[in-house]
């Protein structure tokens, strides 16, 4: 009996030791959206009895992060491998659909729907460019200062207010990651260009040869690791704490993405923000827009949301402040965004929204110099031609020097008389006018064969090689399929005065409908009349290979 008890006690002891060993394992979570080199290197050097690896990315499943949350995965260490552009981690491989938006990281960090994923993190390793870059992002401080001055504030006071708002709201990548990985002791990343996967793997190998694997997951920054990656600008920080000066800002940001809040509750919070000074509302504009765009139809129809939206729509003082700020803005894209948002918030009917957009277009025409960005904006706003019916209310400003930009805006609004003048500018010598025409044609491409043939004929008669290249490059984007136009351009090739013009012609043919091309004739023209160049294997060679394939 004593022997059996001893055996049983020994067995229980072994089981307890095994259980404790298993429990003591640190969980290394990996998010691999590009290179697996870094993950594989960590796996190679970290002992299996102390570390277990969990890949969070499920290939072909877009909601893989939410899936990891539902499985109650708890990470001690997180390794993220992917290119980073400030808003998402992504892959360089065209056949890969996996990516990690910063917005989803914010949601996981702020929401109780994913309490475990980041809650016990001790270390984060981000292998992506600029993940911990400390330079602040795009600032609206100058724009806000100008608005405040126009509203009657002194220049000094306006600059003081805009600086304070910028300090609170303008984030660097480093600030954003500290806000996401709240309370995490160590967060590694790169202040500039990160090494590619294979190079990073080699550096990690050298680190593991010189350091104990126990450093990983210790929650303490490794001087050895930072030293190994010093030439690549690796740096380390810690996640935000409750005592951090920006903790209050994090609380407000989380209100936009916290899954525990209903859309009605989030809208009520937005209503509070819209009651603040408009210069601060401006700083929240991106997040308010993102929330409005994310709503499903069922969420919009929910009784609680309808009531919250009705309360906001009837807040006339907030409405007037918002629209006054929009109309006063000297940034047309911002004004357009605010008009669109005012409609979504119930402050503008469909008719009133159209009225505001028409007023914006009229102000651009009357405001003097019109840029290609202004043309792009108006064409985008009238993508569905909803403003065409009110074209008669738009009046071009007499004596405007920039006739082509004004014509482009009018043409975007459906003016049939302005369109030929814009197309005429495409073959002119004024590079700015050509750029305007190019932007216009991105929105209103040539579909009429007669128009295409007329433009192609004028391009063939141009004498300025640089201007001719600009016009030809525009035609290339139209994917020409008209035989007569292509024949005109084929006849131009032998008469071209520069290699650049010939290459631009080749650029049209390489994108053209090959059914409309006499391949043998074109190959003969290319071979016989090609100008000599020191460059090898250019677009003309690529065209020849394709024609002879």
Predicted region positions:
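Bacterial N-terminal signal peptides
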Residues: 6-17
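A domain-level signal for caspase-like cysteine endopeptidase catalytic cores
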Residues: 21-86, 95-96, 101
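Extracytoplasmic/secreted cell-surface and envelope-processing proteins
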Residues: 38-40, 63-64, 86-92, 133-138, ...
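A short, glycine/acidic-enriched catalytic loop
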Residues: 84-118, 130-132, 137, 146-148
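Active-site-proximal C-terminal subdomain of hydrolase catalytic domains
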Residues: 127-289
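Alpha-helix capping and inter-helical loop/turn segments
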Residues: 261, 279, 296-300, 310-318, ...
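Buried hydrophobic core positions in alpha-solenoid tandem helical repeats
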Residues: 322, 357-361, 389-395, 421-425, ...
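Residue-level detector of extended alpha-helical repeat arrays and alpha-solenoid scaffolds
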Residues: 335, 371-374, 402-406, 433-435, ...
């Amino acid at each position: 009996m004593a022997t059996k008890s001893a055996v049983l006690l020994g067995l229980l002891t072994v089981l307890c030791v095994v259980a404790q060993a298993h429990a003591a394992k640190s969980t290394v979570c990996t998010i691999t959206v590009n290179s697996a080199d870094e993950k594989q290197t960590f796996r190679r050097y970290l002992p299996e009895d102390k570390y277990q690896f969990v890949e969070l990315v499920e290939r072909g499943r877009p909601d893989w992060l939410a899936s990891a949350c539902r499985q109650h995965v708890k990470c001690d260490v997180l390794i993220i491998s992917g290119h980073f552009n400030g808003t998402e981690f992504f892959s360089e491989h065209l056949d890969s659909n996996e990516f990690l938006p910063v917005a989803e990281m914010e949601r996981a960090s702020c929401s109780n729907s994913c309490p475990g994923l980041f809650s016990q993190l001790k270390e984060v390793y981000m292998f992506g460019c600029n993940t911990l870059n400390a330079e602040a992002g795009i600032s609206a401080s100058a724009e806000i200062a100008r608005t405040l001055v126009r509203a009657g504030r002194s220049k000094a006071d306006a600059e003081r207010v805009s600086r304070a708002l910028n300090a609170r709201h303008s984030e660097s990548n480093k600030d954003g990651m500290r806000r996401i990985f709240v309370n995490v002791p160590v967060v590694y990343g790169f202040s500039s260009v990160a090494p590619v996967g294979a190079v990073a793997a080699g550096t990690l190998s050298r680190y593991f040869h010189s350091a104990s694997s126990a450093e990983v997951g210790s929650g303490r920054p490794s001087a050895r690791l930072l030293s190994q990656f010093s030439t690549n600008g690796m740096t380390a920080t810690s996640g935000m704490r409750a005592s951090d000066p920006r903790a209050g800002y994090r609380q407000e940001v989380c209100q936009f993405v916290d899954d525990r809040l209903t859309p009605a509750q989030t809208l009520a919070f937005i209503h509070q923000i819209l009651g603040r000074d408009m210069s601060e509302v401006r700083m929240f504009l991106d997040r308010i827009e993102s929330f409005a765009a994310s709503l499903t139809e069922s969420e919009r129809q929910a009784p609680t949301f309808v009531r919250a939206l009705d309360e906001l729509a009837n807040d006339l003082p907030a409405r007037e402040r918002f629209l006054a700020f929009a109309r006063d803005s000297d940034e047309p894209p911002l004004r357009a965004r605010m008009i669109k948002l005012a409609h979504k918030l119930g402050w503008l009917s469909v008719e009133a929204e159209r009225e505001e957009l028409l007023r914006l277009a009229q102000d651009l025409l009357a405001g003097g110099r019109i840029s290609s960005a202004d043309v792009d904006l108006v064409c985008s706003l009238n993508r569905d031609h909803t403003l065409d019916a009110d074209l008669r209310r738009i009046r071009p400003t007499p004596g405007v020097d920039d006739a082509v930009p004004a014509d482009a805006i009018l043409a975007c609004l459906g003016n049939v008389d302005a369109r030929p003048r814009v197309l005429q500018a495409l073959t002119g010598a004024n590079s700015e006018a050509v750029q305007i025409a190019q932007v216009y044609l991105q929105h209103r491409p040539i579909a009429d064969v007669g128009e295409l043939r007329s433009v192609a004929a004028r391009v063939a008669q141009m004498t300025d090689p640089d201007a001719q290249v600009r016009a030809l490059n525009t035609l290339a984007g139209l994917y020409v399929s008209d035989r007569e136009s292509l024949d005109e351009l084929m006849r131009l090739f032998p008469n071209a005065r520069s290699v650049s013009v010939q290459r631009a012609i080749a650029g049209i043919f390489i994108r053209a409908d090959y059914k409309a091309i006499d391949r043998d004739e074109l190959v003969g023209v290319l071979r016989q009349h090609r100008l000599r160049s020191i460059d090898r294997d250019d677009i003309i060679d690529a065209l020849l290979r394709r024609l002879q394939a």
